[in-house]
């Protein structure tokens, strides 16, 4: 169940302050998550520590639960934390450490 639901974060280990970089979050990277009308990922959120960065909502079986978004950080609030909601199995979380340099 975990391999289908844990949101996997792909991002650099180190970034420069106020410099844009790409973050990809993918659900089902290790084992495909069903994507059908009765079982799908509703949304993915990204946080830096406890600071909310964005939320992407998905249209049920019409879209894959993967998103790439450019972001920038002013300082390290903590690790990147992705949360996702499966309509059947609830909330799941993935974490990636990141360092913000001057």
Give the ranges of each region predicted by the language model:
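Contiguous beta-strand segments within globular domains
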Residues: 15-28
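Surface-exposed, short loops/turns at beta-strand junctions within beta-sandwich domains
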Residues: 72-77
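Extended low-complexity, serine/threonine- and proline-enriched intrinsically disordered segments
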Residues: 38-52
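Solvent-exposed serine/threonine-rich low-complexity stretches and specific carbohydrate-binding patches
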Residues: 51-61
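Short amphipathic, basic-aromatic surface patches that mediate peripheral association
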Residues: 26-36
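Short, compositionally biased P/S/T/A/G/V-rich stretches that sit at domain boundaries
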Residues: 1-16
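Short acidic/polar inter-strand loop motif in beta-rich domains
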Residues: 85-95
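Short strand-edge motifs at loop-to-beta-strand transitions and within beta-strands
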Residues: 65-69
């Amino acid at each position: 169940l975990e391999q289908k639901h844990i949101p996997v974060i792909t991002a650099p280990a180190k970034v420069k302050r106020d410099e844009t970089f790409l973050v990809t979050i993918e659900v089902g990277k290790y084992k495909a998550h069903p994507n059908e009308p009765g079982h799908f990922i509703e949304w993915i959120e990204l946080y830096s520590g406890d600071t909310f960065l964005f939320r992407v909502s998905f249209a049920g079986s019409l879209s894959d639960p993967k998103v790439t978004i450019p972001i920038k950080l002013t300082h390290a609030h903590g690790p990147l934390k992705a949360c996702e909601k499966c309509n059947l199995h609830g909330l799941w979380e993935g974490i990636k450490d990141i360092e913000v340099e001057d």
